[in-house]
Amino acid sequence: MNIFKIRSAALWIGRALSVSAIIALPSMASDMPTSQYHIDSDEIKMVDMPSVLLPFNNLMFLYGVDASQFDLADFIYVNAPDLIDKEEAITHWAGYYSINPKVILTLMEMQSQLISSPTEKALNRPLGALSDKQGFEEQLQDVLAQLSQRFYAYEESQLKGLYPPRTDAVNASSFALLALLNGRRIEQHAVMSGEHALGLDPFIEQFRLLFGNTDRELLMSSVAQNPPVADSTQSMQQVVPLANITASSLPPSNMLQMPWRQGYSWQSNGAHSHTGSGYPLSSIDVSYDWPQWGSPTYSVASAHGGTVNVLSHCQVRVTNANGWATNYYHMDQITVRNGQYVNQNTVMGIYANNKNAALCEGGSSTGPHLHFSLLKDGRHVSLQDVHLGQYRVNIGSYNYDNNCSRFNLFDVSNNRTMCAWAPLYNAGSL
């Protein structure tokens, strides 16, 4: 299996048992945050164009129902046998960034004709000029990262009111695709100087040809754009008050437990985005005792009931029928299978104690832990006010914020506030 590298670094972490007992923090394990992406005003000008009549459906762009039901192995076997040994890389990174594999396959066909006319050159640079990287896995991960960064940056900009759209035909997925496809033009200011920007029509047509989806599935009216959910990070606080977070934007308070077996206590670090930078703060890292590589590690359990997608040898997603899902990364010895229904507290494997197992498709981590994320309909969602069992999350002001006055987990059963690195007993869902 091909493995590529992402930058790594240690984060300062440690133990703090409660508001009343905070001690000095040693260094522990986590993942390296990616650099935060900021929208350029030229990108906003580029997408406000009349050629985009209806926005691309966010639900088709994200790794939601359509993606989870897509038989990638069968599609590759029938249509692109040269990609058989790339299947896990595609599912892993598409799942990690939560973008429909159909999106990346469509872009590959547009850029290199890898599916219809495969060549060695196309296999090495399947996404062509969309990425400066060399190699299949490198370009795959890079372009998915670009799409994810643009998607969530656009949602954040809309929540903050920075760039009010001049057309209803642009949503987060349309912006992400348009900004990616026009990246070179934006860098050269060609779009602003009169050169026509690339619209979404070629992408949508190629998507139709490959997968047979209809316009009704691919496009959406402006009244049903699946709007983003408010976050409470520092960058959002002045724009969307926490009072605006409604019950409909949160999973049921009795739905989730912590992602380890009931009856045990683990520890969590501060909330962060799925990539460690930007918005929303949908994830936490958890471990029994934050050991070194090679030390014993323990069972990961489903936080709720739902259907399993095994995304790779080290990553699993569980999706409930109500659209809420949880993602589990850096796993090993996975015991569940694709399509299996699991109940809450079902053991699905362990978090890996071997670096190569934890990073089965590349990446970096400085020690064993589970990277746990919350999603709704494929979109990463803030953990703010989410109940993980008896603990209600307050995400803090920024990624990996460990200050207990900002990031904490309120124990509603015992009326106390728990800080990062405090032992959290898993009694199941409320």
Residue ranges and their predicted role:
Residues S249, N254-L256, G294, N343, ...:
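Acidic, glycine-rich catalytic/binding loops that coordinate metals and/or anionic ligands
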